[in-house]
Amino acid sequence: MLGGLLHRGHKIKGTVVLMRKNVLHVNSVTSVGGIIGQGLDLVGSTLDTLTAFLGRPVSLQLISATKADANGKGKLGKATFLEGIITSLPTLGAGQSAFKINFEWDDGSGILGAFYIKNFMQTEFFLVSLTLEDIPNHGSIHFVCNSWIYNAKLFKSDRIFFANQTYLPSETPAPLVKYREEELHNLRGDGTGERKEWERVYDYDVYNDLGDPDKGENHARPVLGGNDTFPYPRRGRTGRKPTRKDPNSESRSNDVYLPRDEAFGHLKSSDFLTYGLKSVSQNVLPLLQSAFDLNFTPREFDSFDEVHGLYSGGIKLPTDIISKISPLPVLKEIFRTDGEQALKFPPPKVIQVSKSAWMTDEEFAREMLAGVNPNLIRCLKEFPPRSKLDSQVYGDHTSQITKEHLEPNLEGLTVDEAIQNKRLFLLGHHDPIMPYLRRINATSTKAYATRTILFLKNDGTLRPLAIELSLPHPQGDQSGAFSQVFLPADEGVESSIWLLAKAYVVVNDSCYHQLVSHWLNTHAVVEPFIIATNRHLSVVHPIYKLLHPHYRDTMNINGLARLSLVNDGGVIEQTFLWGRYSVEMSAVVYKDWVFTDQALPADLIKRGMAIEDPSCPHGIRLVIEDYPYAVDGLEIWDAIKTWVHEYVFLYYKSDDTLREDPELQACWKELVEVGHGDKKNEPWWPKMQTREELVEACAIIIWTASALHAAVNFGQYPYGGLILNRPTLSRRFMPEKGSAEYEELRKNPQKAYLKTITPKFQTLIDLSVIEILSRHASDEVYLGERDNPNWTSDTRALEAFKRFGNKLAQIENKLSERNNDEKLRNRCGPVQMPYTLLLPSSKEGLTFRGIPNSISI
């Protein structure tokens, strides 16, 4: 409970920290015809000076936590106004301003628990915190706010903030109960009307805003979510009007509504990063297209050296196009034009030691364990591999790879022995793409469903043994697949064919990675948790305080993705093989999504990459001991789970207290039945009846938002910045003997490879986007950190959190030591690129390391 009684007429000194809107404002992007934006607009706003806050434009009223009025609500103090500017305060962050305030409070009003704030100005500001000092018998009271405050006339009820106490609903001081309930009611809204910029309402909707049917049938996209054909997690509701041609689709606009406090309220270089993403998709993309239309630059790369030239000389572009790109700070940083008429990219890590090591079989295989998509490979349990596609519709899709293909390279084992010894592995890109392959190949892209079988060698590395490329059967789907099997070769035209076979595999892997491993399994699945948490858990609820840092900026980046990246004609559709079917195909994969399998140990066991073994440190034994993502990930997973367990057990003294928590039960019920409503009847959902269920659920949410996202996101440019290594689409089939393409492959294998994979224009767009996505913002908050040290007043929770941070620091040292162990060949590989993606800390920029708390880019 806060403090002791205050003496009658006692003055309480306070400090209010806020940020002016003009400090945080990023100009909207102007039309393509003009200069793209102006960066941060640091001057010329309505709030020219801090003195605008002095006088009576902002009022605060303290609320008692122990003394109630006639309605049973905490007593209100007198309205008080900001008094003076504090010019020096050591704890002030960038762009923050501090003001003095003095409240009158008497002992008849009891102990402080909350405050109201009103803004009478026309312009909103960002309230960071209120700190009350020298409270008798207590010291300081902290209110962590981090919220936009708009003009009071825009709201039916006053804005309220609670002190940093933590209460289960049953433990809330009686005078605060109604305030707590009212605030949650305000955040839920009534589910009607179009949401306005200043609102903080959290609600659900289906993904019905990716297409633009009013532009024509070709621009329509199916509704994802709310139907059995395309189930999907829910997104935040905006309430925009339906399109004219399709009442089930929502009209698009240049700004996507977000609950106001989900938009950036911090001076973050990711303001620039996300602004850069928007600029690339809306402005740079058409500008580059015009350069290609004018034939200013050849449409194809001519050689691998020309691709490497992107990082030295760059791509020459017309002066007027450069002049439109370079004024924007983020793009100046991304493209490094250096005053030259060229776009230049930083050299990706994968070629910093060797320009050709990416071509080796060992590196191709190693990236399945330590690359940007390290959680798809599985242990082969049956041979030949079979399909789960409905044979009534698609016929027989059993693999055509035979034992004779594999056994010459099994180090003396038979296939059966290799399977028994868990030494054969499969990277399967067959079932997700096959039902769409006819449609994909009817466009300018040409691709295969692929299966890759690999063998675990005695030295602990993986060796690819065979790649199967499959097409829909010419005689119709029910006839099964038409398949070819390719084997490794290291010289002659066969080696060029083998390199192409690997490229078709990587194209599928790139698409699956971007749309499923990255977008669906982190960004999209987390959004319903954010919505449910904010609708049902009060800010003083212990689980809200646990999870809230792991939601930072996620709805914002997801809204931007719907606007510019995964929409009709967006960056993903333009640069990835799946094209217009991209997000639709991820919905088909979501049918197999299981929440409880998102826990790393469960995922590894499901893929056959680990076996339950209580004698091992994490309760499981890895099938491949040197599996960098799994080895490092298990350390992080355990640290998260230990921290969550300690924290949950501080507040729930028994399973009964959890079952009787109305906020938690309502939150979980709605998450299952609405947020992931297309999965509501699945038997695997935790019933949320025990503390252990809550621990596991919270650990999965935190793991997904932090470490899993880091593992699949921040390696995108280090690995994929070389399009040769991670092509995103393929444009022609494997050349057949006797054809002109085969002859070209024999005479000029590099040119044939480049004519097959992502062309130059799409490469430039892809690199521009993944370079931004792979960067850390300057004020990123990493796992084990909080953006405010006063996030809770509970010293027990603070001590447990400190132990968590210390554990992560120890893990970081251990991971770095592993990278120096030459016996662990999969950690660095032929490209000599140590696996650092799960090192918790990082500096700003393109670092190939660091685990942010949340999906913030």
UniProtKB/Swiss-Prot annotation:
Note describing how the cofactor binds: Binds 1 Fe cation per subunit. Iron is tightly bound.
Effect after changing residue 713 to A/S: No loss of iron-binding; loss of catalytic activity
InterPro entries attached to this UniProt entry: LipOase, LipOase_C, LipOase_C_sf, LipOase_CS, LipOase_Fe_BS, LipOase_plant, Lipoxy_PLAT/LH2, Lipoxygenase_dom_3
Catalytic reactions of this protein: (9Z,12Z)-octadecadienoate + O2 = (9S)-hydroperoxy-(10E,12Z)-octadecadienoate
Outcome, altering residue 713 to H: No loss of iron-binding; no change in catalytic activity
Domain PLAT intervals: 38-163
Disordered as annotated region, ranges: 212-257
Primary localisation category: cytoplasm
Subcellular location: Cytoplasm
One term of GO molecular function: metal ion binding
Biased composition (Basic and acidic residues): 244-257
Protein name: Seed linoleate 9S-lipoxygenase-3
Gene designation per UniProt: LOX1.3
